């Protein structure tokens, strides 16, 4: 009984996003609060981890900013995540791309794949 009730409550909070996976370059529009103002900040980078766990699904995006690697974890169904855009899809053979942290320059390139129209999750 309680499991069904929790499932019903969680299903009302799940949001639809385009389908993406580790290895994809994404642009995340994230709401941040500065004082009493709210603005949208864009974080663009490579998805190195994606964990599907119902309402607490999360993903990690990594980018290089001023020659320093920056990683940020986002909750997929958070109300602070405004939208997620897939910029390009890359061919990878792993679920977690932690090895990309050590790479730079040409060794950090990934092979791009063409995908059909992206479907919602």
From Swiss-Prot:
GO molecular function, one term: structural constituent of ribosome
This protein's record includes keyword Nucleotide-binding: no
GO cellular component: cytosolic large ribosomal subunit
PROSITE patterns tied to this protein: RIBOSOMAL_L19
Keyword Ribonucleoprotein: yes
Organism: Mesomycoplasma hyopneumoniae (strain 7448)
Pfam families noted in UniProt: Ribosomal_L19
Protein name stated in the entry: Large ribosomal subunit protein bL19
An annotated GO BP: translation
Cross-referenced NCBIfam families: rplS_bact
InterPro entries, A to Z: Ribosomal_bL19, Ribosomal_bL19_CS, Ribosomal_bL19_sf, Translation_prot_SH3-like_sf
Protein family per UniProt: Belongs to the bacterial ribosomal protein bL19 family.
Function in brief: This protein is located at the 30S-50S ribosomal subunit interface and may play a role in the structure and function of the aminoacyl-tRNA binding site.
Gene3D superfamilies named in the record: 2.30.30.790
Gene (name only): rplS
Record keywords, A-Z: Ribonucleoprotein, Ribosomal protein
